[in-house]
From Swiss-Prot:
Any one Gene Ontology cellular component term annotated for this protein: plasma membrane
Keyword Nucleus assigned: no
Annotated family: Belongs to the FtsL family.
Recorded name of the encoding gene: ftsL
Purpose: Essential cell division protein.
Residues in compartment: Cytoplasmic: 1-21
Subcellular location field: Cell membrane
Biological process, per Gene Ontology: FtsZ-dependent cytokinesis
Name this protein carries in UniProt: Cell division protein FtsL
Major place of residence: membrane
UniProt keyword terms in alphabetical order: Cell cycle, Cell division, Cell membrane, Membrane, Transmembrane, Transmembrane helix
TM region positions: 22-42
Length: 81
């Protein structure tokens, strides 16, 4: 009697591709969606940091503008001598 040998890796691959197509597609979808979430969160954090920097610059410019208005008004006032 001859012992029948099975090619186990081949059988596993065949079963996986026959019965696991949906699982592979879902796994790929999960990985892509997770990557998308990471990229969106990273870009959002960059934009928030940029917005904070722009707000600081705006505040500095606004303060400088107010100081210039005060200086202009002080210069245009007639001196009391």
């Amino acid at each position: 009697m001859k012992i029948k040998r099975y090619d186990l890796p081949k059988i596993i691959k065949k079963d996986f591709f026959i019965y696991g197509k949906i699982h592979l597609i879902l796994l790929l979808a999960i990985i892509l969606s997770a990557n998308s979430v990471v990229i969106v969160v990273y870009n959002t954090r960059l934009l928030i940091a940029e917005e904070e920097n722009l707000n600081l610059k705006t505040k500095k410019k606004d303060d400088e503008w107010r100081n210039l208005i005060i200086e202009k008004n002080a210069i245009s006032m007639p001196s009391i001598h």
